[in-house]
């Protein structure tokens, strides 16, 4: 009998300690209202590189490092970060932090397959001794990408999120 009373007491206590929804208000959403998509982070670009947002996701730059050759390739992508976005520029500025100092590099246009004449979606920094000596993997890439696209200058930071 004593155990039965103890059991009833414990169950009653558990029911009293439940969630209190008294502080939560219900907000009805008007019919036809749409929820705005939240900004999201892209993990990897179509070439397996790190994505850099240019503007308010108007464009993206994909940064790809070939550790064997120390070549850095930048791909200009559209707002979806999936399709090439060929631009008129002959170069893109790549600023990297090397030895705690910012260093500027010029990535030259190298037309990619499918790029129209006089436009490029691919830019490269190749055979650079500073990059060869200091950039060993993607984690060493810290800095920014600056590109002139359709008369507007876009700059995006190379950020590694862990």
Name the predicted role of every residue range.
Residues 1-17:
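Sec-dependent bacterial lipoprotein signal peptides
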Residues 10, 17-162:
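Intrinsically disordered, low-complexity terminal tails/loops enriched in metal-binding residues
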